[in-house]
Amino acid sequence: MGKVLVIQGAGMNMRGKAQLETFGPMTLGEMNEQIVGYAEELGMDVEMFHSNIEGEVINALYAAHDDDYEAGIINPAGYTTTTGPIKAAIAQ
């Protein structure tokens, strides 16, 4: 498989720093390291992306389309309730 974009949504930078009783101690960096490691085992080229800014996520989705990424995985996190524009970008 070729390039895959993994997007971590709003608030993920606070994992391992806040609400530990709910989300546990793993940080965003540690999550990303696990994902990249697993992808390497599968022979995949993965790019990790995080932003708390909805427009930056939309731009990353469009850029991935233009750069011929084969797949995208999104953990919307804090965007789950306000993602009209992100949903539209994914659909395109």
What are these regions (language model features)?
Residues 42-91:
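Helix-adjacent hinge/juxtasegments
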Residues 1-4:
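Extreme N-terminal starter segment of soluble prokaryotic enzymes
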Residues 31-46:
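A short, N-terminal amphipathic alpha-helix
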Residues 15-30:
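Glycine- and acidic-residue-enriched helix-capping/strand-helix junction motifs
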Residues 12:
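ATP/NTP phosphate-donor binding region
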Residues 26-29, 33, 55, 84:
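Generic alpha-helical secondary structure signal
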